[in-house]
Amino acid sequence: MAGRARSRLLLLLGLLALQSSCLAFRSPLSVFKRFKETTRSFSNECLGTTRPITPIDSSDFTLDIRMPGVTPKESDTYFCMSMRLPVDEEAFVIDFKPRASMDTVHHMLLFGCNMPSSTGSYWFCDEGTCTDKANILYAWARNAPPTRLPKGVGFRVGGETGSKYFVLQVHYGDISAFRDNHKDCSGVSLHLTRVPQPLIAGMYLMMSVNTVIPPGEKVVNSDISCHYKMYPMHVFAYRVHTHHLGKVVSGYRVRNGQWTLIGRQSPQLPQAFYPVEHPVDVAFGDILAARCVFTGEGRTEATHIGGTSSDEMCNLYIMYYMEAKHAVSFMTCTQNVAPDMFRTIPEEANIPIPVKSDMVMIHGHHKETENKEKSALIQQPKQGEEEAFEQGDFYSLLSKLLGEREDVVHVHKYNPTEKTESGSDLVAEIANVVQKKDLGRSDAREGAEHEEGGNAILVRDRIHKFHRLESTLRPAESRALSFQQPGEGPWEPELAGDFHVEEALEWPGVYLLPGQVSGVALDSKNNLVIFHRGDHVWDGNSFDSKFVYQQRGLGPIEEDTILVIDPNKAEILQSSGKNLFYLPHGLSIDTDGNYWVTDVALHQVFKLEPRSKEGPLLVLGRSMQPGSDQNHFCQPTDVAVEPSTGAVFVSDGYCNSRIVQFSPSGKFITQWGEESSGSSPKPGQFSVPHSLALVPHLNQLCVADRENGRIQCFKTDTKEFVREIKHASFGRNVFAISYIPGFLFAVNGKPYFGDQEPVQGFVMNFSSGEIIDVFKPVRKHFDMPHDIVASEDGTVYIGDAHTNTVWKFTLTESRLEVEHRSVKKAGIEVPEIKEAEAVVEPKVKNKPTSSELQKMQEKKKLIKDPGSGVPVVLITTLLVIPVVVLLAIAMFIRWKKSRAFGDHDRKLESSSGRVLGRLRGKGSSGLNLGNFFASRKGYSRKGFDRVSTEGSDQEKDEDDGSESEEEYSAPLPTPAPSS
């Protein structure tokens, strides 16, 4: 009895203990109160996905992130959805399991961030993924198996520094599987733990942005290489990606000339993350290298890096882990810093991996998209240089990197051979790589949802060949293009008459190839002065979230960063600036010949005497200390010095939105400006004030408000806003401006996905703001034109921070004059129009001054004014009446003669039919005056009288009159050499 009681007591105590332990157990669901706010009502067809959180034990749980039952309406649709991390404390993702099939999903990307681009249950990814910094956590495509992280390795989320939200992006390539209109709930399941992981995972992306595959070419190599300049990382998995033409992708670590394989795989196999065969560590000073081998066989035209399956891509994703205290979650490489090194690449990298046909079918790209018109890219990816967008938005671009639209870039398709039409790359336009914005389709995505909301984060998701990552600023707001200049509407370039700028093809300076060209200026002798970055590159690893430079260990640039170039021979006349700068940016020259430069890494402004070796004359700002007070800058961009007063104006900058004025001695005077807000920024608001231009005689300072795509002008004395210049053709960015009396020159940035405006230079009438010319280079192409300077004779120089190139442009013959000569060449004499036309040959020494050019424009305006002179209708009427009278007389004579001498055996016709029948040419159903007059006696087109054919009315004239319809055709231009 006592034993039974004892057993019952033990059982009761056990139950109580179990209950208390259950009460003490803190289920993940118990802290998910906020999660209820965003719980989704899934479609009935998605049953089983309605429980997104499942506890595993006291510290671990799974999180299902799935589409809430969607049905894409068109191929190549990108849908995004977000889910908040259901815990406040730090957690770690230690496993992923894809919940998708290639039958419906082309690829998926999972990002971590703190602010999704939308709060809806799902949205078109054209609106972006995140509005702040985002980290890619996972990528899946082509029925890939789950990615396994090594023990002790996890992606850090939550807490004070980790991401609070997950954003899932799903690319639906072929929608034929949705013909039954079923709902899709594809996604990924995460295994999370609260247990701190000693090793933090990250992703290193290597990608090409400028590969061109000629048609029919058997083997084409695309090489990528970058110096590794971070704490050691340990590679444990990799993934390759190309489209149809890729044969093999190989990745290596190069240390002291020795190549160590990271991974090698056929991109035609399922595109999973494959584990490395042997552990590979990468340390400071190593080089990471990758090669993609393509074939152009079977193609009839060149294939470029792009976002459709008929384009190509060359991507290698390296998954790594680092010690938690040094961890960096994402790094990129889009350059080839050591092209000669690939001469020693292991032979295996050049050998395609055989793939069975059934395996190709398993993972093949969707065929229905192959013949689609190639979408314009972009882009650009910035290649680490300055696109003031969050590094995270860069990942949106990654979405394009994973599939048929996975390019980077850019909106405007990168095509190095487009010399006159495009002038811009992919990423970039991936380039360009970057955030998914409208991919060029117009149906379901157009409208307010796309036009107004779609730009919010996409502004940050361009790669601009990935050098434009230049900063990790907050993304610019959505903005609609406005027109505040008189008479502006949908923009059409007025390439009229007497002002046209073209590249000076004889100038050899385009092949100088210094480092990233950040600034250009002209000294008092009209010598070109270049400010460049040598072997330093501004990329996503350059700054932390507080804009503190992270690569001080590299030391200053060990070569001369300021080059004085002969404007004709492009010879280096003088150089300076060694061991002074880390990341050069703006350059200007005052009336005394002093150089004013900015360094975004140092957060400082320097005044330099060109030939002095005693150091700067003046330094503003604190070295390596970003700030926003009177003594600090935050990545200052440019300087302008007023000639009359010596006042110094500094545009500050990437992380401040202001203009700061100093005295000639460097004393703070005043500042103005604030950060832009909303889609319609107000006067005096800036989003990266990037370039300055003084208009001395009007006491105005004009600012290239880069990310707002406009130019703002202010009074230098009162700081009063004067006006805004903004054109649709600017696109979303205005990078740099330069003023000469009467004219304002500007250069824009690469287009975003879905945008049409190419990257190009502009010439504007300063008084009216109207665009009077646009121009692009012939040799090479603009990728990220970063600065512009013009001389008073109309010579223009543009420096590109991505292609490391400087172009020279000069005034050329006016278009009107060329047409005038063409008319004369055709045998028609036209009186010379001397006052309205200016013929300016590129090599003429005495080029017209800017004041003369301004007069030309005024005269052109008078000539074009429709309100002046005799009305056009009256002139036309006076000209037409004599022609009608002569025609009537001729027809009457013809009719009379045919009655007297016509063939009486033919079938009678009405008089009207007889006349019109005679006036018809071969195969014609209307009046042919050429054949009519050709039948008259004494008329000859070739110097001989035509033999009469009136005796045979039933025979049609075998002469089709083509000779009488000859037009003068100018010979086709010789194709420009590709570079």
Curated annotation (Swiss-Prot):
Keywords: Calcium, Cleavage on pair of basic residues, Copper, Cytoplasmic vesicle, Disulfide bond, Glycoprotein, Lipid metabolism, Lyase, Membrane, Metal-binding, Monooxygenase, Multifunctional enzyme, Oxidoreductase, Phosphoprotein, Repeat, Signal, Transmembrane, Transmembrane helix, Vitamin C, Zinc
UniProt: Cu(2+) 2 binding residues: 241, 243, 313
Cofactor binding remark: Binds one Zn(2+) ion per subunit. Binds 2 Cu(2+) ions per subunit.
Biological processes, Gene Ontology terms: fatty acid primary amide biosynthetic process; peptide amidation; peptide metabolic process
Activity regulation annotation text: PAM activity is inhibited by EDTA, phenylglyoxal and diethyl pyrocarbonate. PAL activity is stimulated by cadmium and inhibited by mercury.
Chain residues that bind Zn(2+): 585, 690, 786
Phenotype seen when the gene is deleted: Embryonic lethality between 14.5 days post coitum (dpc) and 15.5 dpc with severe edema. Edema are probably due to cardiovascular deficits, characterized by thinning of the aorta and carotid arteries. Loss of amidated peptides.
Residues with the Phosphothreonine modification: 949
Gene3D superfamilies: 2.60.120.230, Copper type II, ascorbate-dependent monooxygenase, N-terminal domain, TolB, C-terminal domain
GO molecular function, one term: calcium ion binding
Name of this protein: Peptidyl-glycine alpha-amidating monooxygenase
Annotated organism of origin: Mus musculus
Gene of this entry: Pam
